[in-house]
Amino acid sequence: MRWSPDARGRLERAAFELFAEQGYQATTVPQITARAGLTTRTFFRYFADKREVIFAGDEIPDLARAAIEGAPAGIDPLDIVVHGLRTVADDRFEGRHDEVGSVRRLVLSESSLRERDARKRADLTDAVREAFVNRGLDPSEAAVIAETTVMLFHLALDAWLTGPAERRMADVVDEQLGALRGVLDRRPAAS
């Protein structure tokens, strides 16, 4: 078969169409490649397996690490987190509400995909924690900020996906952060 432009994109579109039509489990790699008009060999140049079609290209942990480590000295860790979450929301999710929602529903429908998603969350948490430790933050504080960052990201993602498509995810990040600050502001004073 001759070289075809945008092979990766064609494979992704074909896979998601088939997942929607017949389900994730029932879809095979040969079906995906036939739909895309490509060979199975081409598929495996881009993806290790069909699961990786969903999770491939996920460089968010590397982006998070670079953003945190590259932030100017003296900036409050929470300000770094907020800026990072807003940036990811705008760069990765804006204008993709329906597409992201379809992927999220697919992930939640399959136990093997939920496991991979949990691994992704852990990888992101580790990347954020390590980056803050590299900035000189105490390891226990870095762990708290990392867990909080990933929790806020996923709460915002879920709230955004269940709301109207016109809402900006960055605005939902701000709402979730406001909710967290409201809870923390109500904490009893230390005795």
Q: Residue ranges of each PLM-predicted region?
A:
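Amphipathic alpha-helical packing segments from all-alpha helical-bundle domains
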Residues: 110-135, 143-147
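Alpha-helical DNA-contacting segments of helix-turn-helix folds
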Residues: 47, 51-62
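Hydrophobic/aromatic-rich alpha-helical bundle segments in the mid-to-C-terminal region
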Residues: 135-178
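Polytopic alpha-helical membrane proteins, predominantly small-molecule transporters/carriers
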Residues: 15, 101-102, 109
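N-terminal intrinsically disordered/low-complexity leader segments
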Residues: 1-4, 184-191
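Hydrophobic alpha-helical connector segments
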Residues: 63-103
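Short hydrophobic/aromatic patch on the recognition helix
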Residues: 38-47
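Basic, helix-initiating cap at the start of DNA-binding domains
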Residues: 1-22, 26-38, 55, 63, ...
